[in-house]
Amino acid sequence: MDHKKFESLIKQLYSTVNELESMFPGRHFTPDGHMVGSIGESLVADAYGLELMTASNKGFDATSTTGKQIEIKASQARSAAFRSEPEHAIVIKILPDGSFEEIYNGPGSLIWRQFSDKPLPNNGQYQISLNKLKILNEQVVESMRVPRVI
């Protein structure tokens, strides 16, 4: 894959969003839903050298070169949602310029423990704030992280 072309296309997309929002004040053109998920999964797969599974794969989105199953969560808001305990999770926040900030990169068990005393929400998804994930990320030792390749 052409990493530079991919990066350029994502930046163009977010630049277009910013231009449209400037042209039409009060209107939001922010990508959401499946588009954000697919963009996030692609950004992470590219940056960490992961192999993506088919879309909507149950339980994980990609595998690492060592075979680790990775759930990828991308947000433009303040939280991420989990339906089940992942083996490993990488959570990112997509920034307005199309780049991303790594919020969490570590074992899924550390996240899942946060839900242990909570009833399952009606929508079947536990929510966790990006701020809480940043705090949890500080507890992850380097050897437990999936390293970036670019």
Predicted stretch roles:
Residues 1-150:
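Nucleic-acid endonuclease domains
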